């Protein structure tokens, strides 16, 4: 049995094969001594270093890596057998340009040969010479050839001598801006600056006019100096809309030169290649022959050896121009390898060992094109921000693989840190197929499989390129990206799982994201969802509405023999008891049960009112999505919303077109019945809302807000005659249904009988709907009295969500009417199950439950007339401020405030105005008499002042005088309907503004949310962009996050469920962050979460606030290399302010406005993160 010695760190056994299988020298060629290479150092980093290491390992060659201090954690140093630090104390790029250190490492570690990779020193003749002088082989051309080809001006002269056509340009590097001016005068614009000692797009700048000349010259020089250690430039005529075709060549030390056909590198931005294709599609065979023969001719002219690339521009007429020779391996060498089956790195190494191309079996006649290959460079750049590099920690990395896919990468793994110091390349994806469309399909599929989280990438942009018809046809040129702006219509990645982990981590570190009024944890048990039968739910009143329209629906309601119920559990009940905090997640769970078991309901109140803004403000949910999802789950029961007349679902007046559009879109999303009211019963506001709802095709239910007591002869302001007169106006305006909206629960049975019977007698064919609250405890009796007096519909809530400030009990009404002519036909057993679910669900909202401070309703509501939801809120506020014992004083002040304002109808927003004034009086220790007497000197709440100005309408009986005049003094007064004087809102302009801020995925619903609540909507969008679809989390997780070791599932959508386990939270790091560890679908995930409390005690550079005009933030992470202005300087729009450098690319930050620099927050050489504040302009 053969025994082999242990191999340490490399596959040296393969060396046996290498030495024993070397072919014999050709008898016709003078042989050089064959010197096997045993140890290779790659003087580079990243994926190209790994590419060479892999080739060496396959050949049994030991590998050596070098790395800078900034690259300590990079993968390339781990892929080598040995790795050594270079450039200690040097800048990141300079470390890889420090020839003495690199040579020292090579000599000290017995390196036979150095592979330069690409970039850095790969085209530096002095480096090739230094290797040669040190007795280390340079895997590339000779130093002299590197010098000639690296000097693009000399290369150009050689091309001319070889008879290869060239673009008009300077004969030598220019040394001044004056020379650039002279060239422009001779050849005209456009021209292009190019770095004389490197490529890759650095140091390249196209200039279209004299005005651009100086800035672009300066930037090109600076970039070339930073990237290649030499800022020399040459200038040439810029050929517009050419194809960029390059030919791969390979030579040996015996004068043999061959080509491996061409690559099309036309898809570029900033002269840097993005997608490369081999072979070039639809290339004329004669042009291909000219390109390849000229490339070989040029290589022979200089005695080229090893791998290289000859680059050409091909104009629209098929004429080609030599650009340059890259005397190194190219980034895109991979596509050539795929179509020719030639390993170029193997060939490079063998040539450096002294082997000839024929020895390697490489003869021109044997090189054939096999199919097509495409390479996409996946980078950490943001196409939406002009491809600005992004930096940070990769939280998730999952690549696309499979048949026909090759990946060349380096530090593309979870936990890798992308720094601003080097190139933004993350991974090269190479697809190979039988033809161009097949390769494009494979590439598109592979990119779709990628998941990169934590840093932005250009994947969405690449996918757009691959789906572009011009690209698929193969007819692209270097203007392809510029001429196809639709490539930048990027479909954002959903990234839902990672965003949810960020949210859960944030809550685990910082606590709840929504204000918690009471320290009470959610119930540990989930509510029990009753079983639901399979199949569609039974027909309900919505089927009649869809079939017969609003008029037919109203007739069916009026002709129904028994009492109909509207369930408020999905809106007003939880607004009254749970601070409007019930989430869509819990509504959706019980929704199918409601659809199947409560089809006899008149409607469900589930939208509008306070739920609209609270959904966005505190629950981070889209109210429109709630409507859409509930509509899908409950197709048979009409939905009802609360529309505040001209206020829609807001607290102020909006232009008429906003209200009309809102109703239109609400109807399109599934809303059926619009209960239109006005907080002052101000008829013009109500008529506008009714018209908007009616024109949208909805059922119009005009609601008269009730206050006072029609059965009390002493209460004359809001008498029976007042309500009957108002009802006449609303019926005349065409309401389909008439509603009495008793917000405080003031309707007593006697008053119910008087009011409802009078309305029934006057409007025998009109459906009557009564809404109340049970604050006094008389709600069930009142609703029974209404039903007996002729009401068609009364409001109820699930038993466990009824009573107190909510609606009367559903079960009580069902039981009391059972077996009578008013029978609701609702099964009691279903009511019990429904109530049981809500009893469990209510426990999840313990922190918001009114019973934390309020143990019962109170009949004093007949005196203070506080609406149900507001009663709960005021009670909460009083207790939270330690004034629980003084709640009686708050209620007394409420009564006085109401009288000061003229005895208002109290419902949002008028109830809030009364409440604000009451709290103002309590906080300042004012009685009514004192407040009225000092009215001219006091600074009343804004809501009170605006009410007195007339901004929400005119109250019944007019404004209180002289109180109004004392408060307003010289302030303007609104005459008539407030919204009538408002100009129409430009909804299209608003949509564009939202798209500019939030991206293309802006919907008509978003536009209306922003129109109603601009600040709330903006925060909601920013929050969910960071933390994802939070309505998919259960309520316990949403409020308090998971416990360590807790396992749970999150259903993102049907068929997509995440299995998550919380593992650990780390200690605080120096950046004020904690690392939170999870297991997601069996894989470890970790995220960094800022500890907001700890960060208050730490100093960080301020961020630019997007909403503050004049605050200029860093568009990308990077280093400040130049500051163009000082504090006090006048700046024009577009004027350069400073220059940032990141990933060897410089970005000029320009002024977005004209103004004066107020303060500069950065200094030269300062390193910035994205959005760090640079300066302020005023």
From Swiss-Prot:
List of residues binding ATP: 152, 236, 271
N6-acetyllysine: residues carrying this PTM: 35, 39, 79, 148, 152, 241, 297, 319, 434, 589, 661, 717, 748, 892, 969, 992, 1061, 1090, 1124
Pathway: Carbohydrate biosynthesis; gluconeogenesis
Keyword field contains Glycoprotein: no
Enzyme Commission code(s) on record: 6.4.1.1
Main subcellular location of this protein, as a coarse class: mitochondrion
A Pfam family: Biotin_carb_C
Modified residues (N6-succinyllysine): 79, 442
Domain Pyruvate carboxyltransferase: 563-832
Gene Ontology molecular function: ATP binding; biotin binding; identical protein binding; metal ion binding; pyruvate carboxylase activity
Subunit structure: Homotetramer. Interacts (via the biotin carboxylation domain) with SIRT4.
PANTHER family in the record: PYRUVATE CARBOXYLASE, PYRUVATE CARBOXYLASE, MITOCHONDRIAL
Protein name, as recorded: Pyruvate carboxylase, mitochondrial
Taxonomic source organism: Homo sapiens
Name of the gene: PC
């Amino acid at each position: 049995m053969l025994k082999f010695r242990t191999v340490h760190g490399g596959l040296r056994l393969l060396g046996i094969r290498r030495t024993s299988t070397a072919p014999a020298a050709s008898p016709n060629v003078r042989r050089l001594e064959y010197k096997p290479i045993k140890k290779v150092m790659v003087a580079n980093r990243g994926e190209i270093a790994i590419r060479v290491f892999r080739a060496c390992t396959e050949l049994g060659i030991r590998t050596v890596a070098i790395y800078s201090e900034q690259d300590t954690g990079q993968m390339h140093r781990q892929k080598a057998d040995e790795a050594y630090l270079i450039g200690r104390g040097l800048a990141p790029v300079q470390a890889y340009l420090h020839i003495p250190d690199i040579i020292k490492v090579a000599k000290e570690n017995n390196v036979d040969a150095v592979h330069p990779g690409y970039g850095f020193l790969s085209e530096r003749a002095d480096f090739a010479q230094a290797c040669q002088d040190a007795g280390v082989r340079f895997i590339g051309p000779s130093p002299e050839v590197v010098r000639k080809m690296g000097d693009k001006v000399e290369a150009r002269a050689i091309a001319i001598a070889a008879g290869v056509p060239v673009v008009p340009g300077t004969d030598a590097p220019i040394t001044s801006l004056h020379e650039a001016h002279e060239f422009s005068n001779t050849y005209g614009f456009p021209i292009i600056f190019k770095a004389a000692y490197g490529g890759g797009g650095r140091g390249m700048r196209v200039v279209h006019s004299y005005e651009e000349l100086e800035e672009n010259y300066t930037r090109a020089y600076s970039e070339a100096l930073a990237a290649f250690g030499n800022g020399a430039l040459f200038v040439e005529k810029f050929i517009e809309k050419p194809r960029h075709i390059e030919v791969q060549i390979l030579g040996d030390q015996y004068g043999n030169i061959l080509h491996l056909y061409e690559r099309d590198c036309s898809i570029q931005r900033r002269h840097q290649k993005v997608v490369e294709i081999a072979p070039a599609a639809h290339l004329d065979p004669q042009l291909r022959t000219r390109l390849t023969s000229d490339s070989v001719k040029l290589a022979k002219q200089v005695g080229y050896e090893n791998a290289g690339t000859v680059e050409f521009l091909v104009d629209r007429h098929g004429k080609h121009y030599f650009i340059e020779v890259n005397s190194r391996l190219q980034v895109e060498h991979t596509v050539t390898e795929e179509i020719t089956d030639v390993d170029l790195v193997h060939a490079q190494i063998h040539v450096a060992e002294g082997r000839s191309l024929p020895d390697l079996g490489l003869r021109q006649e044997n090189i054939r094109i096999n199919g097509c290959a495409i390479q996409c460079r996946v980078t950490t750049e943001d196409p939406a921000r002009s491809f600005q590099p992004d930096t940070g920690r990769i939280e998730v990395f999952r690549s696309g693989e499979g048949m026909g896919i090759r990946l060349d990468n380096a530090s593309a793994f979870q936990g890798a840190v992308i720094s601003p110091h080097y190139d933004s390349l993350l991974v090269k994806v190479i697809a190979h197929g039988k033809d161009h469309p097949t390769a494009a399909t494979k590439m598109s599929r592979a990119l779709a499989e990628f998941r990169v989280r934590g840093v932005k990438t250009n994947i969405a942009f690449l996918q757009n390129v691959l789906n572009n018809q011009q690209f698929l046809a193969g007819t692209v040129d270097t203007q392809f990206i510029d001429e196809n702006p639709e490539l930048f219509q990027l479909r954002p990645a959903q990234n839902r799982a990672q965003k949810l982990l960020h949210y859960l981590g944030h809550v685990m570190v910082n606590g709840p994201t929504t204000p918690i009024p009471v320290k009470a944890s959610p119930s540990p048990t989930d509510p029990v969802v009753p079983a639901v039968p399979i199949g569609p739910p039974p027909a309900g009143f919505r089927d009649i509405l869809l079939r017969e329209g609003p008029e037919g629906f109203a007739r069916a309601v009026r002709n129904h023999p028994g009492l109909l119920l509207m369930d408020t559990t999905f809106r007003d009940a939880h607004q009254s008891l749970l601070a409007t905090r019930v989430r869509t997640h819990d509504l959706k769970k019980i929704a199918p049960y409601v659809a199947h078991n409560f089809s006899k309901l008149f409607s469900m109140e589930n939208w509008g009112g306070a739920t609209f803004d609270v959904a966005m403000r505190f629950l981070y949910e889209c109210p429109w999505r709630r409507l859409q999802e509930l509509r899908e789950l409950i197709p048979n029961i009409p939905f009802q919303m609360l529309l505040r007349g001209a206020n829609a679902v807001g607290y102020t007046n909006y232009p008429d077109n906003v209200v009309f559009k809102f109703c239109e879109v609400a109807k399109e999303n599934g809303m059926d019945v619009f209960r239109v009211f006005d907080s002052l019963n101000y008829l013009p506001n109500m008529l506008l809302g009714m018209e908007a709802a009616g024109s949208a095709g909805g059922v119009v239910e005009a609601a008269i807000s009730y206050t006072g007591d029609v059965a009390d002869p002493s209460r004359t302001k809001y008498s029976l005659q007042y309500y009957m007169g108002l009802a006449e106006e609303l019926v005349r305006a065409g309401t389909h249904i008439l509603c009495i909206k008793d917000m405080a629960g003031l309707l007593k049975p006697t008053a119910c009988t008087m009011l409802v019977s009078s309305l029934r007698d006057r409007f025998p064919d009109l459906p009557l709907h009564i809404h109340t609250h049970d604050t006094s405890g008389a709600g069930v009796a009142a609703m029974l009295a209404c039903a007996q007096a002729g009401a068609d519909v009364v409001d109820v809530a699930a038993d466990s969500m009824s009573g107190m400030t909510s609606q009367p009990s559903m079960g009580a009404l069902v039981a009391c009417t059972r077996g009578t002519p008013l029978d609701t036909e609702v099964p009691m057993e279903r009511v019990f199950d429904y109530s049981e679910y809500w009893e469990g669900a209510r426990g999840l909202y313990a922190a918001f439950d009114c019973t934390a401070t309020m143990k019962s309703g109170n009949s004093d509501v007949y005196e203070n007339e506080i609406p149900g939801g507001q009663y709960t809120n005021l009670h909460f506020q009083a207790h939270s401020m330690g004034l629980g014992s003084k709640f009686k004083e708050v209620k007394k002040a409420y009564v006085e405030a109401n009288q000061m304002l003229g005895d208002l109808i109290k419902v949002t927003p008028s109830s809030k105005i009364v409440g604000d004034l009451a709290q103002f009086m309590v906080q300042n220790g004012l009685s009514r008499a004192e407040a009225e007497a000092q009215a001219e000197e006091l600074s009343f709440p804004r809501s009170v002042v605006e009410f007195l100005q007339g901004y929400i309408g005119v109250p019944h009986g007019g404004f209180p005088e002289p109180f109004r005049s004392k408060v307003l003094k010289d302030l303007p007064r609104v005459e008539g309907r407030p919204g009538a004087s408002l100009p129409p809102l430009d909804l299209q302009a608003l949509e564009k503004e939202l798209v500019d801020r939030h991206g293309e995925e802006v919907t008509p619903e978003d536009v209306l949310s922003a129109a109603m609540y601009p600040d709330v909507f903006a925060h909601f969008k920013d929050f969910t962009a960071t933390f994802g679809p939070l309505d998919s989390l259960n309520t316990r997780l949403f409020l308090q996050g998971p416990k360590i070791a807790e396992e749970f599932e999150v259903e993102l959508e049907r068929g997509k469920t995440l299995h998550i386990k919380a593992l650990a939270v780390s200690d605080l790091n120096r950046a004020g962050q904690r690392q939170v560890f999870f297991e997601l679908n069996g894989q470890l995930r970790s995220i960094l979460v800022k500890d907001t409390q700890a960060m208050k005690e730490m100093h960080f550079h301020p961020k630019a606030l997007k909403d503050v005009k004049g605050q200029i933030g860093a568009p990308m992470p990077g280093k400040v290399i130049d500051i163009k202005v000082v504090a006090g300087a006048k700046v024009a729009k577009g004027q350069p302010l400073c220059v940032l450098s990141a990933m060897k690319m410089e970005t000029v930050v320009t002024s977005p406005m004209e103004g004066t620099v107020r303060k500069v927050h950065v200094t030269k050489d300062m390193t910035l993160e994205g959005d760090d504040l640079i300066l302020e302009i005023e």
